[in-house]
Design a protein with these regions (language model features):
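A short hydrophobic beta-strand element
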Residues: 72-83
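Short, cysteine-centered beta-strand-loop-beta hairpins and adjacent loop/turn segments enriched
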Residues: 56, 84-93
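Short, low-complexity N-terminal intrinsically disordered segments enriched in polar/charged residues
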Residues: 1-25, 29, 73, 123-127
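A solvent-exposed, acidic/Ser-Thr-rich amphipathic alpha-helical stretch
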Residues: 6, 20-71
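Short beta-strand edge/turn micro-motifs at domain boundaries
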Residues: 95-125
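Short, surface-exposed coil-to-beta transition loops
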Residues: 60-63, 78-80, 93-98
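Beta-strand residues in well-ordered beta-sheet regions across diverse protein folds
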Residues: 34, 78-80, 112
Length: 127
C-alpha cells in the first residue's frame, strides 16, 4: 500500500491555510482550480483574489477525507471542507467537496488540479 501521508499533509495544509502563502509552493506550474461556476483559475489567479482582499478566508475545517488513491507518480483525493469566507463582502458558509489530482514532481507531491463543488454537500451521500 502506498504512503498517503504526503497527500494527507497537502490536504491538511490547504484546509488550514489562512492566506494565499500555502498555494504557490504546493502546486504544479500548470495547476488549475475549477470553481463551482465551472470557470477555471490558475494558482496565480487565486493568489490575486486573496491579495486583492476580494476573497477573505474566515475559517476552514477538514470534515472528512473520503478517498486517496496513488498510482505511481499520480494521485487523487476527495475531501470535504466546512468553509466560511467572504467574497466581495458577501459571507458564504459552505460545506464543499473537493476532487484533486496530485503529481509527484522530483519526489515532492503537489496539487495539479482542484475542483470544488457548490457549498451544499450532503454528507449522508458519502455513507
Amino acid at each position: 500500500m502506498a504512503n498517503t501521508s504526503p497527500i494527507e499533509d497537502l490536504i491538511n495544509g490547504y484546509a488550514t491555510s489562512e492566506d494565499s502563502s500555502f498555494l504557490i509552493p504546493n502546486v504544479t506550474e500548470d495547476f488549475l482550480a475549477v470553481r463551482p461556476s465551472g470557470n477555471p483559475i490558475s494558482a496565480k489567479g487565486l493568489v490575486g483574489m486573496f491579495d486583492s482582499k476580494d476573497l477573505v478566508a474566515e475559517s476552514s475545517e477538514l470534515i472528512k477525507t473520503h478517498k486517496i488513491e496513488i498510482y505511481g507518480e499520480i494521485a487523487y483525493a476527495v475531501f470535504t471542507l466546512n468553509e466560511i469566507f467572504s467574497y466581495k463582502g458577501n459571507q458564504n458558509k459552505d460545506l464543499s467537496t473537493y476532487t484533486c489530482i496530485f503529481k509527484n514532481v522530483n519526489g515532492t507531491w503537489k496539487y495539479s488540479w482542484m475542483q470544488r463543488s457548490q457549498g451544499t454537500t450532503d454528507m449522508k451521500t458519502w455513507e
